[in-house]
Regions:
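Soluble "head" domains of membrane/secretory-pathway proteins
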Residues: 1-15, 26, 30-31, 35-36, ...
């Protein structure tokens, strides 16, 4: 009799594993995935070793917005994943002059970007970047420590994996949409 019981156990265990895989695999593949922050480029918003959940679904339904914190495949090596903040949107011109960033939108209006999330601007240079359709300009919040669009160019839309949806670790900083700002796009008009 004990043999029948162990066969039942293994059959039930196999069914459980199959059902769990059928539920978890599609979610992991199409909806959300884990991401561990590596480095100081997004400090103080995100610190090295923090554990995030990436929302992969939203950008299939809508376009990324300025100020969104995104995870993407590094254009120079698609096996590497980076985390940065969106500064410039498709067809815009991003102008950097020292610590000041201005955005010239597709309609010709220019705004000075307000960046309360940046603790260290570093020594900014003067440069201008014209974005094409489906290109984004991304930067780290800790500018001196960030390898971003200023260094390697614009980010193709197809490289974006998703946005930071939830910070899970450390436990004292758990939260949804960490690093998001609702007023980032309302920069001050430039005369």
């Amino acid at each position: 009799m004990p043999q029948k019981s162990s066969e039942n156990f293994f059959t039930e265990l196999f069914k459980f594993i199959l059902i769990a895989a059928a539920i978890v695999f599609p979610i992991r593949l199409f909806v959300a995935q884990p991401f561990i922050v590596s480095g100081a480029s997004m400090s103080p918003t995100f610190n090295n070793g923090q554990y995030l959940i990436v929302d992969e679904l939203s950008y299939r339904l809508q376009s990324p917005n300025r100020g969104d914190v995104i995870i993407f495949r590094y254009p120079k090596n698609p096996k590497e994943f980076f985390i940065k903040r969106i500064i410039g949107l498709p067809t815009e011109t991003v102008s950097i002059n020292g610590n000041a960033i201005t955005i010239t939108k597709a309609d010709g209006k220019t705004v000075a970007l307000s960046e309360p999330y940046v603790a260290n601007h570093g020594n900014g240079s003067a440069n201008s970047y014209q974005l094409k359709e489906d290109e984004y300009f991304v930067m780290g919040d800790n500018r001196p420590e960030s390898s971003d669009s200023r260094v390697w160019g614009t980010l193709p839309r197809d490289n974006i994996v998703g946005r930071a949806f939830m910070r899970l670790l450390p436990l004292n900083s758990i939260g949804f949409f960490p690093g998001s700002l609702s007023t980032v796009d309302t920069g001050t008009p430039v005369q």
